[in-house]
Swiss-Prot record:
Disruption phenotype: Reduces secondary metabolite production, including sterigmatocystin, a carcinogen biochemically related to the agricultural contaminant aflatoxin. Results in constitutive sexual differentiation. Impairs defense response against D.melanogaster larval grazing. Residues 1-75 are annotated as: Disordered. This is Protein-methionine methyltransferase laeA. Self-methylates at Met-207. Residues 23-40 have a biased composition (Polar residues). GO terms for molecular function: methyltransferase activity. The gene is laeA. It holds the Pfam family Methyltransf_23. Its EC number is 2.1.1.-. It is found in: Nucleus.
Length: 374
């Protein structure tokens, strides 16, 4: 049922999509592209100095880290309380830097959710590898939107001679991490940044849909910061529910996704994912050798294949932890729904996620794209 290989495809209103107790209305064929709007300049700019020890250190020469394992420049944790300030909304904690720009919370519940998705992605890849794209073992790796830092930390542990940097809007990364790994937050990767053009061996981005306004600008910036011949890897979930029968008809799951798609489009940070737009934007940015893989993510273990069932168990847990987190800010900010209405819809969706009579699945997209050699 699930095939590996390329697939191509990508309303604003203050009123949520019409429904009749979750009656499903077929979505429009319109597949709007991502916003091309620019962001304001970022006031935190450079982390260009640090290099992998084995590549640049020589006997008796200067080490790229100081005695306590910190880089020669300080990570981007600001002492300005306004930058690190968090705020409460709907009983959840959100980041304070560029308040309201990102619709997901950053509290412990959300951090657990992000770590579950990280595990899901490694399981879904079969080989359970952290990176698909070619890369040196002593390279410079950059993780955009690193969240809890789990990917960066695991890569740093696996490749002790590499340097791994993670950037994120929220400073939620652990203070204790490998000495060859650093985090820089708050950091808005959509704003202009200078982190050493032509200096990174791999740039990684995971689950950016819903947080990015201008994909073409972001891809051009990523392209500029990679070394010639280096790779960019992106992992995204298309949350639009699919099934190969009619078990999704009239479900809360379908209604929930339609509402979420519309609300995030209204905020100009659409959660809807288009592989066609992604590949075109990567090509327009200058990338070549673009590889696109898709993996089916069953919503619960209804599938007969054992690997699919293993993936489904992790994805069921991930989705169960995600529905309310994904819904709170978009539905309250855009539709002005009361908390009780959001929680009721989330509960209905979670109930369906455990129903093996509903044969729903989502699609995981994995992209690798190379910056050409000069």
């Amino acid at each position: 049922m699930f095939e590996m290989g390329p697939v191509g495809t990508r309303l604003p209103a203050m009123t949520s999509p019409a429904h009749n107790h979750y009656s499903y209305h077929s979505p429009t064929s319109s597949d709007r592209g991502r916003s091309r709007q620019n962001s304001d300049a970022m006031d935190i700019q450079s982390i260009t100095e640090r290099e992998p020890a084995t590549r640049y250190a020589v006997a008796g020469g200067p080490a790229p880290w100081n005695r306590n394992g910190s880089p020669s420049m300080s990570p981007m944790y600001s002492n300005n309380s306004e930058r690190n300030q968090f705020h409460e909304e709907n009983g959840r904690t959100y980041h304070g830097f560029r308040r309201g720009m990102y619709f997901l919370p950053c509290d412990e519940q959300e951090q657990d959710r992000l770590d579950i998705f990280h595990k899901l992605f490694t399981v879904a890849r079969v080989s359970e590898s952290l990176i698909y794209a070619p890369h040196p073992t002593n390279g410079r790796f950059l993780d955009l939107g690193c969240g809890t830092g789990i990917w960066a930390i695991e890569v740093a542990n696996k490749y002790p001679d590499a340097f791994v940097a993670g950037v994120d809007l929220a400073p939620i990364q652990p203070p204790n991490h490998p000495k060859n790994c650093e985090f820089y937050a708050p950091f808005d990767f959509e704003a202009p940044w200078a982190m050493g053009e032509d200096s990174w061996d791999l740039i990684h981005l995971q689950m950016g849909c819903g947080s990015v306004m201008g994909w073409p600008n972001l891809y051009r910036r990523i392209f500029a910061h990679l070394r010639p011949g280096a790779w960019f890897e992106q992992v995204e979930i298309d949350f639009e529910p699919r099934c190969d029968d009619r078990s999704l008809d009239g479900t809360a799951l379908r209604h929930w996704y339609d509402c979420l798609k519309q609300a995030t489009a209204e905020t100009m940070r659409p959660i809807a994912h288009s592989s066609r737009d992604t590949i075109k934007d990567l090509q327009d940015a200058g990338f070549t050798e673009i590889d696109h893989q898709i993996v089916g993510l069953p919503l619960n273990p209804w599938h007969q294949d054992e690997h699919e069932r293993k993936v489904a168990r992790w994805y069921n847990l991930a989705v169960s932890e995600s529905i309310e987190n994904l819904s709170l800010a978009p539905f309250s900010r855009v539709y002005r729904w009361p908390l009780e209405r959001i929680q009721q819809l989330a509960a209905d969706v979670k109930s369906e996620a455990f129903n093996k009579e509903i044969h729903a699945y989502n699609i995981l997209h994995i992209y690798q794209a190379r910056k050409p050699l000069r």
